[in-house]
Amino acid sequence: MDQTRDISLEGWNIVRADEADWVPWTGSAGEARAKILGTADGSMVTLVEAQPGYAGSPHEHAHSEFNYVVEGTLRSQGQQMSAGDGYAAAAGSTHSDFETEAGATYIVIFKI
């Protein structure tokens, strides 16, 4: 018996990672690519693969931002982070330091 047939997906955006396209992910240095894994109400869940030497561009967060490191290491706001680490940045906070020397894969959730 298929118990999922009566479950509504209204308001849901479920994306299969193997069906999502990689798109360029911009920064101030190095290369990265991303897969958009879901969007809702202006927010998105994004899987990012950053190559060694990638650095994000400084910016202010208009909305909160959440990050989870899946693999590798990165530095955010002067703090070293590795697989399993994460951060939450409040709306209005300034992101002035984001870099990976060795490369990293991470999930970032934010609103545009």
Task: Outline where the language-model segments fall.
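A short, N-terminal "cap"/entry segment at the start of jelly-roll beta-barrel domains
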Residues: 1-42
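Conserved short histidine dyad/triad with adjacent acidic residue
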Residues: 27-33, 38-60, 80, 90-94, ...
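Conserved GNAT-family N-acetyltransferase fold
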Residues: 48, 67, 87
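Glycine- and acidic-residue-biased ligand/ion/polar-headgroup-sensing regions
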Residues: 52, 62-76
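A short hydrophobic beta-strand segment most commonly corresponding to one strand
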Residues: 88, 101-112
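Short, Lys/Arg- and Gly-enriched loop/turn segments at beta-strand edges
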Residues: 96-100
